[in-house]
Amino acid sequence: YTTLFRSEYLYLDLNTCERCMGTDKVLEGVLDELSNAFKMAGYSLEYHKVKIETAEMANAYRFLSSPTIRVNGRDICNSVQENNCGCCGDIAGTQVDCRVFSYNGETYEVPPAEMIAEAIMRMAFRPKVSSCCSGGYVLPDNLKKFFDGKHQKCCESTCSCGCC
């Protein structure tokens, strides 16, 4: 029989944000490298990319910070660390903090492949526990600022979202 292994990549932008684009590229490379090993171990790999476009989507996905990588519903990071993301600030027209990744005593805006591979392997084969998405959720202030700023910027220009 085959066991399902689910990986999700949640992000704000893949056109402008260097963190999101870089993490996307590294994650896809890691999943490509690991896919044969998972197949050999009897795992079926399911991969989903989710662009979080609204505060409502962020709430539905219990999105804490961009970018986020989840394995079987659990964030690969034990905590959320952030710093100013100029790219997302440009999108929203206001200062926005996005995720940074700590690995082996260093901090990265784009996580190294080794960190992602190690986290995926550790989480894929650990016993099933309740997902990170249980319990209370409140939209983090950084995401509220991003979505509010993005909406305001859209409405000040030629509104393409149809909300104004």
Residue ranges and their predicted role:
Residues 15-18, 87-89, 153-164:
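Local cysteine-cluster metal-coordination motifs and their immediate loop/turn environment
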Residues 52-59, 64-66, 70-149:
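Thiol/selenol-based redox catalytic cores and closely related redox-interacting motifs
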Residues 1-4:
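Short, small-residue-biased leader/transition segments that mark boundaries at the very start
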Residues 20-36:
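Typically the conserved alpha-helix immediately C-terminal to a functionally engaged Cys/Sec
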Residues 32-42, 127:
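Alpha-helix termini
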Residues 6-13:
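Short beta-strand segments enriched in small/hydrophobic residues
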Residues 40-54:
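Thiol-based oxidoreductase modules, predominantly thioredoxin-like and allied folds used
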Residues 16-22, 82-83:
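Short, flexible/disordered intra-domain loops and linkers
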